Regions:
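Interdomain/boundary linker segments immediately adjacent to catalytic/signaling cores
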Residues: 1-70, 242-248
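Catalytic core segments in nucleotide and nucleic-acid processing enzymes
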Residues: 68-248
Length: 248
């Protein structure tokens, strides 16, 4: 179409461009008019129900909801003084760890104690092959971070852990238990844990649902209408309202 328009004389081309522009603006206005309103923050009981659903199985949200819940759990799993220093919170599921130079979807670095903890969200069943692929990338990431880390301490001093958070870890053999792997001059502890196991270690779902502000900022706002593609927000609404019509 545009190739053919380019063959027209300038006055005709300009007129056609104005018409197309008006049509596009009308289409955008209609789309915005039909856009669903944002959901209010769910009540505590609904947050409990949502976390229970997420703990059971893959959320069928292309990894988006799984990763946002992993962010929420990771923050609560770390000391409060490190939470503001987290790298990767809320990042896109399409962002690569290599491009962001982080060892997991979210990373916490404690320079004072020379430790790094990364959390890698994985919806569904986790397999050894996935971890191996991630460790191959991790070697490149640590190579890039080597200068930064060496300024603080030698590689032997650093305590590095990657926690792989999935719904099912029963198929793991090589990494069925915490395993120390040598990666680019660093000893890295590989630890696989289920969503339900991590939730239990943090005091249980009921206790987690009480963190209203964190849930709002790390989960609710990130998957609400307007923040992600509409099908993801619809899936979030389904999970948050499942089996209860009065949720807010």
């Amino acid at each position: 179409l545009f190739a053919e328009l380019g063959k027209l004389p300038y006055p005709s081309r300009r007129h056609a461009g104005c018409l197309i522009r008006r049509w596009l603006c009308r289409r955008l206005d209609r789309i915005q008019e039909n856009k669903p309103e944002k959901l209010p923050l769910p009540a505590e009981k609904s947050r409990i129900r949502f976390l229970k659903q997420v703990s059971k199985s893959n959320t069928a949200s292309l990894g988006v909801i799984d990763q946002r819940v992993c962010d929420f759990l990771a923050v609560l799993d770390q000391p409060e003084e490190l939470r503001k220093k987290a790298r990767g919170l809320g990042s896109s599921v399409n962002e690569t760890n290599l491009s962001a130079a982080k060892i997991g979807d979210v990373e916490f670095v404690d320079y004072g104690n020379h430790s790094i903890v990364g959390y890698e969200a994985h919806g569904g069943q986790l397999r050894d092959e996935y971890i191996d692929l991630h460790l191959n990338t991790l070697a490149r990431i640590l190579s890039e971070k080597r200068l930064e880390l060496r300024e603080e301490a030698d590689p032997a001093v650093w305590d590095i852990t990657v926690k792989y958070v999935a719904h099912d870890i029963s198929s793991l053999v090589k990494y069925a238990t915490p395993t120390v792997v040598r990666v680019s001059d660093y000893d890295v502890t590989v630890l696989a844990i289920t969503y339900s196991g991590l939730m239990d270690s943090l005091g249980g779902i009921e206790g987690l649902a009480e963190y209203e502000e964190l849930f709002d900022s790390l989960v609710h706002e990130k998957v609400n209408y307007g923040a992600v593609p509409e099908p993801i927000s619809k899936r979030y609404y389904e999970l948050i309202s499942l089996s209860n019509s009065s949720i807010f």
